[in-house]
Design a protein with these regions (language model features):
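Forkhead-associated
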Residues: 3-8, 12-87
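Regulatory inter-domain linker segments that are low-complexity and enriched
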Residues: 1-3, 88-117
Length: 117
């Protein structure tokens, strides 16, 4: 499940799981991700999620939205991208579907074809 890790000056403030098709980000208290700082607009940006695609859209904010240090209006997000709003950094993390490396598979005799002559 995609998630956002919000930090300032290297200190993590919060972690938010993205569970909705539309997640709002801004200074106002009704946003899904609230960043209470004057450098962040009341309705700063929105994160759209559809299937396996996630994108961020700037909502005409005063100070802009940056992805990997580049000003964007609308941008697809990739695992590890850094979003900047004001002095805040938001790390976007998205685990690949179906990768359950922590699970052990047990094969019984006859389940795997024999190799060799």
């Amino acid at each position: 499940m995609p998630r956002m890790i919000v930090s300032i000056d290297g200190v993590v403030i919060k972690e938010v799981q993205l569970t909705k098709e539309r997640t709002t980000l801004g200074r106002r208290p009704y946003n899904d991700i609230v960043i209470d700082n004057l450098a962040v607009s009341g309705e700063h940006a929105v994160i759209h999620m559809a299937e396996h695609e996630v994108e961020i859209e700037d909502l005409g904010s005063t100070n802009g939205t940056y992805v990997n240090a580049k000003a964007v209006k609308r941008q697809d997000l990739r695992n590890g991208d850094t979003i900047e709003v004001g002095k805040y950094q938001i790390r976007f993390l998205q685990e690949a579907e179906g990768q359950n490396f922590d699970k052990t598979m047990i094969f019984e005799p006859g389940m795997v074809p024999a190799v060799g002559p």
